[in-house]
Amino acid sequence: RSSDLHLVVNWGSGPQQMWAITNPTSGKPKSNIWMLPETINSFFFRPGFTWSRRSAKGLSFRALPVDCVFSDKGPTVFCADDETDELLSLMAILNSSAFELLVSLQMAVGSYEAGVILRTPVPTLSHDQKSRLAQLVLRAWSLKKRLDAAVETSHAFLLPAALCKSPKDCDAEIVAAEVAKIQAEIDATALGLYGFVAGDLEANSD
């Protein structure tokens, strides 16, 4: 799901304004990522997905649309050619129960450092697998956006829920059930790709 972007930066003259926000003790920019030209030149403004390094809600990767910048508090994943199916299928794998299990074996609960995400293995996908997973992610996003279309404070707002042409389009329970089915298929696919069986997840939770 792509969230509303509630923070913006003035990039009219590049990172100069951000560089001017310094730590009073060191005199250096508060976020060192702004001092890395390679990051600015090679990664800013590209599509990808991000996650929270620390979260009590569990590991969750979210879409990062084009024309965004990021800092160390919100690490970001990119694909070499910014290819849509590559990004979406990878997001599916990283949001699977199998991937979360592998991450949980390496870190304390609620802590998801970039190094751990980087060294957690990702299975190789066939063209058909990549295409199917990308379709599932797009479908889940579309369902969530459908709900946001009736939320007046959302960037996706279209009309009040009472005016929805089809009641199911704005029914949170129906949408949640459909999204759960999508997640179940993603989880089953990821389990097979990693060579796990369903019991492996239950055994680890015990």
Where are these regions (language model features)?
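Polybasic, glycine- and aromatic-enriched phosphate-binding surface used to engage nucleic acids
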Residues: 1-135
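Non-catalytic DNA-recognition/assembly elements of restriction-modification systems
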Residues: 121-206
